[in-house]
Amino acid sequence: MYSKLPFYRLAELTGTYFTGELLGLRDFIPPFAASEGRNIMDGVNYASGGCGILPETGRHQGEVISFDQQLINHNRTISRVTAALSGDKKKTADHLNKCIYIAGFGSNDYINNYLMPNLYPNSKIPPDQYAQKLINKYTQQLSTLYNYGARKIAIFGLGPIGCIPQEALSSRPNLLGCVENTNKAVQQFNNRLKPLVDDLNAKHPGAHFTYINVSNFAPVIGVLNKPCCKISEGAGAGQCVPNSAPCPFRSFKPFFDGFHPTETGHILLAGRAYVSASPADAYPYDIRHLASA
């Protein structure tokens, strides 16, 4: 089933292109900085590598565009959509109500914030309190997105961050190659997403928020977490060593470097998000059903 609905992506992850493909998009949706003319009617990509829910997340890497700033950028897009529809605000609202919004945040709030005690004071907060801090901010941001006209919003949960190659290298993994304390901290955030969806749907008339349970897609990936390239242990830790050759068979590797899944991993994520293979994959429904909501 192809919905061919406009697709707005506010996120930090990269695999949602394949979700857009399943929804009937024929090409990449343009990044916000390059969006122009009527191509904005098919969707806009606001994602920024390293960004997060909290505005300070990832700042040690340089300039990143936080979720707060992405919302500001989306509001600018809405003004341009209205202009493309001859100033008709009702048509604009109708258009936005039909759009699919993908919100995938939180990973960097751990990788590029909470798990970096030398750079961010949040590391001193107990895991449950930090998770609630993220949820409180996320609730405000997603409510703003609703107030801008969004009605169909898929919220992606976090995968087992304690199993990514860089985390396993920098800490003491278990026999499966995963750092249990990290996964437990991340699960505190994931556990709050279903109640968040219930709360948002109850408080916002006409809203269709749904939760995509990414952690259910790959419950045990630690034993497979060898990266495709040799990763740096110094500056740029976790990234591929410059000029090093990647593995010849990338389709057999779930991770390209110390952090990022390969295309194979992203295709798996998109497929399960679009059509759930288990009742635990999505709540209350997968993206295919969200499209027809």
Annotate each language-model stretch with its function.
Residues 1-293:
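Conserved active-site regions of diverse hydrolases
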